[in-house]
Amino acid sequence: MMKLRHKNKKPGEGSKGHKKISWPYPQPAKQNGKKATSKVPSAPHFVHPNDHANREAELKKKWVEEMREKQQAAREQERQKRRTIESYCQDVLRRQEEFEHKEEVLQELNMFPQLDDEATRKAYYKEFRKVVEYSDVILEVLDARDPLGCRCFQMEEAVLRAQGNKKLVLVLNKIDLVPKEVVEKWLDYLRNELPTVAFKASTQHQVKNLNRCSVPVDQASESLLKSKACFGAENLMRVLGNYCRLGEVRTHIRVGVVGLPNVGKSSLINSLKRSRACSVGAVPGITKFMQEVYLDKFIRLLDAPGIVPGPNSEVGTILRNCVHVQKLADPVTPVETILQRCNLEEISNYYGVSGFQTTEHFLTAVAHRLGKKKKGGLYSQEQAAKAVLADWVSGKISFYIPPPATHTLPTHLSAEIVKEMTEVFDIEDTEQANEDTMECLATGESDELLGDTDPLEMEIKLLHSPMTKIADAIENKTTVYKIGDLTGYCTNPNRHQMGWAKRNVDHRPKSNSMVDVCSVDRRSVLQRIMETDPLQQGQALASALKNKKKMQKRADKIASKLSDSMMSALDLSGNADDGVGD
């Protein structure tokens, strides 16, 4: 038995519990009965880090020199190619072959013009059918520059064949882009078929309180038509009011607005509503679904997406802005048609180019003028053609088509339909009113009662305008049968005058104390603000802006009151005429 003091004793080298430490490397095998000598492996060869860095620097320097030599050789080779005439001719031939190949591919794929797909066209036609079904009166909007080109006879035939005895009215929009004499001729031509109303939509970009001018279209001057205010709304509302009165409508009517893309359907609705109720733009296809807009408690407007008629020429479809300009595969051909139809002198003056003989020369000059280039520094005729088409559809290039010399009634219309439409809308009364105003037309320019002016001056013009005679007559319980001369009460302000200069307004005797508040000189207001303490100028400016907003609201209230007074006066005159006739 082991003693306790020997129990934890470490075993010695010769004891039984001692293990011999083995050599970490394997023992060499015996060769020919003799034990081989063991070789201890030596440490690897040590390489200094600077040797690797120097080697890499040498390789990089050699690579940079090789690349520099290759670039110099490529530049010299390119320089030699440019110097030779043969290489230039070969480059021209290569580009011509590429262009011809591109034309062949376009013709094979039938990519001109790129209209909407079949599903989209069916969806638009479905929305059009819904508008026709729900409407009592259909307003077909036409472009005054080309009314017959924008007129869709298939659409009119579908409206006349629909159930419910639908009524159809033509609206000649964009009359500010056509001379006044041409507009009158088109009105006389179209009124032989259907009731026609001249109209100009508002071109303002604000959301509310769109301006509307009460001056009749026949009486408005050229400068007045070029303003941003709306024209023809009163006449159109009178036509719809005649339908409600003669048709004995007890509740309300729905008025559908249809037509080709980009003829101004949504702009017409916004002008009647005097607010931005529908999205508008110079690109076709913005309106995709039927939209209902409440005009008042008697009239509801239905906006429909534009429809492109089936049998139509490709170039004509593009020139009527029925296709996106940026999606055209070949915009050069429509530009060639424009140069054939329009006055070349006006186009040359507009773009500042002259002396061109072909369409290619014209587009190259326009590309040089506008800076339209492509890769290689060459002028892009495609981009120049798209820019010309964009100016065409936006109305910057003036053009119009005169009405035909002889009138022929379309096949889908008959004498009975024309007579019925005339009696329902009482067009003869409207034409007689226009003739009376033409007789009272003075030699001077018309007044811009609700044009694009400052709110202070707008209120001054409203208070001085002859429309106050109607309001005074209604207050005195008298009947007004005819609106007198609307000219000569205030001068036409220069809307392009810069700064805070005074407007030349003919101040007549004022019966309202509001005029003294509105006729404050704006220069004196600024002068008072500048004379105040610099620490209080911000507060003074905020107070001036607050007063300006107050004047704007006051002018809007007066405008609405005067418009209501005018409509009630016209109703009184119509009832008086009926009583005299009885």
UniProtKB/Swiss-Prot annotation:
Keywords: Coiled coil, GTP-binding, Isopeptide bond, Nucleotide-binding, Nucleus, Ribosome biogenesis, Ubl conjugation. Residues 58-88 form a coiled coil. Residues 1-58 are annotated as: Disordered. There is a cross-link at K477 (Glycyl lysine isopeptide (Lys-Gly) (interchain with G-Cter in SUMO1)). GO terms for biological process: negative regulation of protein binding; negative regulation of protein sumoylation; negative regulation of protein ubiquitination; negative regulation of telomere maintenance via telomerase; positive regulation of protein localization to chromosome, telomeric region; positive regulation of protein-containing complex assembly; regulation of protein stability; ribosome biogenesis. CDD domains: Nucleostemin_like (cd04178). GO terms for molecular function: GTP binding; RNA binding. InterPro entries: G_CP_dom, GTP-bd, GTP-bd_ortho_bundle_sf, P-loop_NTPase, TRAFAC_YlqF/YawG_RiboMat. Interacts with MDM2; this interaction, which occurs in the nucleoplasm, stabilizes MDM2. Indirectly interacts with TP53, via MDM2-binding. Interacts with TERF1; this interaction probably occurs in the nucleoplasm and is increased during mitosis, when the nucleolus is disassembled. This binding may promote TERF1 homodimerization. Interacts with TERT. This is Guanine nucleotide-binding protein-like 3-like protein. It comes from Homo sapiens (Human).
